[in-house]
Amino acid sequence: MSDALVLATTDVASIRPAAAVVIPLLAASLIAVSGRRPNVREAWTVAAALCQFALVASMVPDALAGRLHATNVGAVAPGIEFVFRADPLGMLFALVASGLYVVTGIYSIGYVRGLGEHAQTRFFAALAVSLSGAVGVAFAGNLLVLFVCYEVITIATYPLVAHEESAEARAAGYKYIAYAFSGGIVLFTGIVGVFTLAGTTAFAPGGIDALGEVDPWLGRALFGLLVAGFAVKAAVMPLHSWLPDAMVAPTPVSGLLHAVAVVKAGAFGVVRTVTDVFGPAAVADLGLGAPLAAVAGGTILLASLLALRQDDLKARLAYSTVAQLSYIVLGVALLTPAGLLGGLLHFPAHAFAKLTLFLCVGALYVETGTKKVSEVAGIGGRMPLTMAAFAVASLSMAGIPLLAGFVSKWHLLVGSVAAGGWVFLALLVVSGVLNVAYFWPIVYAAFFERPDDADPKPILDNPIGGREDAAGLRTDGGNGEESDPRGERVGWRGDETTPLLLGPLLVTAALTVAFGLFPDHVVFLEVANAVVESVTGEGFP
């Protein structure tokens, strides 16, 4: 559909894309039968994450060379095959999701044991299935396969959102399911429409040719159905309210929702719709780029203003995510190569920084019980590494140079100018200022303010729910034995938190810095540039 040169690619029959999807499913089964052996259960979690990431990473060189690994499971209906295909766009999302599954899985072990969480086996099994769905979305070769994997994410993340089983958690879970399934119905309606008119749902760089011949109003309707269906999970306003409510979930789940799988899957679907279903040329011809950009811009501004009002740390991060995910939508809606590149680079840039923020908030809660912005005064002296990582991620979210957020936002600024969207240029600058306004007071209070009372949030001894006894053996930490629900208020071995909590957040903070300092040496830029070339025929040196 686009006049741009589409780079030649060749499908290579391979089991690897399907294996990357199936491995977490197998791990979920093994986790389920290992419930009485927590160390074995958690070993399966980490092993599955590492294997999935290794498989995904192994396909990157071939994807960049135009050799696309594909697994054709077979035809599910005339004209529709169940295909997993590792193209550059899918590789970008799969690399982020599978890589951060490793980090989230390790962190989750420390978190659920530290708090003595119940139903840990269910937690880790659902986490594994969620990542299977996320990589399935990434490698889906057509809209139908994407839809199936998209709904797998919905089903798998419901027990994670409602994990606490409180009235508030159940209500949040029901709301999430209602929104997600409603969006799924809208999405499926659009998929049926695409197949009816085009005779295929297979993705094609630059768009499906047959959709360029349909009646313009019918084309706009189909585009609206697809984008609206994906926008629910992407938390685009006014379809966002499920996300702040879902923050009742355990912090690793919040990180999964925001940085790894759920909202990223929604944003990914919007990108697929613009680039590989309709194509930028058709979207421009139908006059749909400007309205989509306007919705994204409004979401960025309103969500940033709402974030300023939140005292709950996770709620502030939730509204930040609502705003930040619309950067991706805005980038693709600008219909310029630079805008598309910026939107694509925001997948890893936002993921690294936002996951860091959530992991820091989780560590604060495990060790001190801190949940609110108004409670962080002086906590930087107790947990300096944690709050330093929080500061780095906050600066990245604001788009400060030499950090990951600047890399993506710079290209978004360039794309806005190229599109003549000076309003969006100004909006991006204002959004950066608002990010500073709602993140930096947390960092300042943590390091430079004194608490009102002598020791408002001392570090807990265990972490909560588990500790080592005199014999050096770790107590239950939530695996079936009774344990102190809070622990004693002194430092755990004199450290700010356990290695299982501190290590992952330092890794994601380091990735945020590395991506900002050396973007040309990080694979995400090369992969994103390959997507831009395949869709528009234009690349960046």
What does each of the following model-derived ranges do?
Residues 201, 383-387, 441-541:
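Cytoplasmic/organellar membrane-interface segments at the starts of transmembrane helices
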Residues 2-10, 182, 204-218, 282, ...:
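Inter-helical loop and helix-membrane interface segments of multi-pass membrane transporters/permeases
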Residues 103-116, 121, 127-146, 156-445:
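Hydrophobic transmembrane alpha-helices and their helix-loop junctions in integral membrane proteins
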Residues 61-69, 194-202, 519-524:
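Helix-to-loop transition at the C-terminal end of transmembrane segments
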Residues 151:
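Short phosphate-coordinating micro-motif centered on Lys-Gly-acidic
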Residues 46-60, 180-191, 393, 505-520:
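Hydrophobic alpha-helical membrane-insertion segments
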Residues 2-18, 26-125, 466, 472, ...:
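Transmembrane helix-loop-helix hairpins at membrane boundaries of multipass inner-membrane proteins
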Residues 38-49, 171-181, 383-387, 495-507:
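Alpha-helical transmembrane segments and their helix-start/interface "positive-inside/aromatic belt" motifs
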